Amino acid sequence: MTVGWVMLALAALAAGDEASLRRLELTNLHGGEKLTVTFHNEHDIAPDALGALRHLLRDYRVNKEHAMDFGLFVQLTDLARQCGVPASYEVISGYRSPATNAKLRAAGHAVAERSQHMEGRAIDVRLKGCPLPRLRDLALAAGRGGVGFYPRSHFVHVDTGRVRSWQE
């Protein structure tokens, strides 16, 4: 009888582990690179997966990588779950170097002088299968950081900075 309960407990633990598993698929639209990573939390993701994420989200204009806030990846998987679709994102922008940020500002693009992109704390994305206004609403409701809505450019900005919002 005890063995039966132990087996049931192990099965429940295994199911719980499976339920907490996060899968994130990113496609960088500047070059078409694609990456899929699976993790439970920041402590169990493989170091080479973190390196691959850093590379995929690099500033493609100057080919410079930067560490990304792991909270972004958790936030992206949570948003996809709430939208009821797989976490399959198209990435418009991840890390942005200070030099690139300054060039974009000088060219008249609407980028913040102290952009969270320069800190590796922001990402501009589209979530496949989730309407853009719904993705924005879910990100706003989560209250985990900044949310920018760019309907003309067709993306949502999410970051792990202070809670705030804006629109194109």
Locations of regions flagged by a protein language model:
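Catalytic cores and adjacent binding grooves of peptidoglycan-active enzymes
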Residues: 22-27, 110-168
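Active-site acidic/histidine clusters and adjacent loop/turn architecture
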Residues: 41-90
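Sec/Tat-exported extracytoplasmic proteins
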Residues: 76-83, 87, 99, 129, ...
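Near-N-terminal "mature-domain entry" segment
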Residues: 17-48
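N-terminal export leaders
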Residues: 1-3
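A structural signal for short, well-ordered beta-strand segments and their strand-loop junctions
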Residues: 88-92, 148-149
